[in-house]
Amino acid sequence: MLLKLKCTVNNYAWGPKGNSSMAGSLALDGGHIPNLDKDKPYAEFWVGTHANGPAHVIEKDIALKQLLATSPELQGKHEKGNLSFLFKVLSVLGPLSIQIHPTKEQGKLLHATDPKNYPDDNHKPEIAIALTEFELLSGFRQHSQISEYLKLYSEIQELLTEEEKSQIDSLGSYGESSAQVLKKIFSRIWRTPKEKLQIVVDKLARRIQGHENKTALDEIIVYLFTLYPGDVGVFAPIFLNYFKLQPGEATFLEPNMPHAYLKGDCVECMADSDNTIRAGLTPKYIDVESLVEMLNYDETLLPKYIPNELDDGSLLFTPRGIDEFWVQEVKGPAGSIYQLPYSESCSVLTVLYGTATVTLGDASQVLNRGEVVFIGATHDAERPKINISDDFLAFRAFTPSPRALESLSNKRLIID
């Protein structure tokens, strides 16, 4: 079964305004919204069944969640009624919050104790695939490098105790766990009362602003300071890796990995959750205590994710240890035919650019930029075929079957 979907858009303040937003223009071109307001930000385009942004089946005029609940034959035996994933297109003009996402156990606890700010009980591992050059902070730097930066940006030490100052040199060395030392230092800084914090943030940022030859790190700190003066998140680049993804490159964000997107466009896929623990660079609710206790303080090399390359040259993103989602890149030049694999799973296909006709059995749908189609589980020998009219790029998100997950472990990949 092939069914076009009407999906939702979120207007978070960090998104570009009007038609400068890829997420917004996709939503407009795909018929998901009637127009673009030039003065309104368009940050995220959602495809999924999450309660905060559920997709609807256009021709049946019902929520996709409702259709799946009443038509179990559209899914595989391993699927659970709702989509187990949430697919997004993000357009980022200003920085997102310093944040982490919880494990399953932590998600249950957060939701039970604070359902207003943690709207579900799930974890939220996620993969981000760049569509344009994409800048972000993610994962802790090498601890020895953090040690050097705490000396270089010495104003930060005004927030530490004498004991904590004396431990800066031990970051990256043996003895007491380097991660435990980092936790002490990071927690102290992030727990600093706002009034004291503002003084030190301002002092550091204004000194850097006076530099004639600013380093790349100087520039990021000053940039964050101009947007969030006095905010503890201004210090984040001192602790976290800064890097850029080029189009097609990806990063996988495990639970409790600190990160903040800074600029660019990407697609994201994650477990079906909207749980985010924030602590800086945001006017939204922040939860410093949960963040500093749950953070993974291990050092992380640049966390780029290397996908599987398929025989046709397209890419398949299969983060290990995650059974809720895989993402398949679907692309081809005008005049080509792309055949999707047999699948025990339902999937959603979101078109980034181009035009194509998708055929499955007797059903067919013409897809243009921004349109989204739900593809029911095929179960047998049926294979969806995509006849490409114009140069085409889309992403197919689905929940892999147990057989597919096992094939990943055996290094003999099966896509279903």
Curated annotation (Swiss-Prot):
Residue positions of the active site: 278
Main location: cytoplasm
Positions that bind Zn(2+): 99, 101, 126, 259
GO molecular function: mannose-6-phosphate isomerase activity; zinc ion binding
Location(s) in or outside the cell: Cytoplasm
Record PROSITE patterns: PMI_I_1, PMI_I_2
Enzyme Commission number(s) of this protein: 5.3.1.8
Catalytic activity: D-mannose 6-phosphate = D-fructose 6-phosphate
Disulfide bonds: none
A biological process from GO: carbohydrate metabolic process
GO cellular component, one term: cytosol
Required cofactor(s): Zn(2+)
Top-level EC class as recorded in UniProt: isomerase
Pathway: Nucleotide-sugar biosynthesis; GDP-alpha-D-mannose biosynthesis; alpha-D-mannose 1-phosphate from D-fructose 6-phosphate: step 1/2
Keyword flag Metal-binding: yes
Binding note for cofactor: Binds 1 zinc ion per subunit.
Presence of the UniProt keyword Ribonucleoprotein in the record: no
Alphabetized UniProt keyword annotations: Cytoplasm, Isomerase, Metal-binding, Zinc
Role this protein plays: Involved in the synthesis of the GDP-mannose and dolichol-phosphate-mannose required for a number of critical mannosyl transfer reactions.
Similarity annotation: Belongs to the mannose-6-phosphate isomerase type 1 family.
Protein name (record): Probable mannose-6-phosphate isomerase
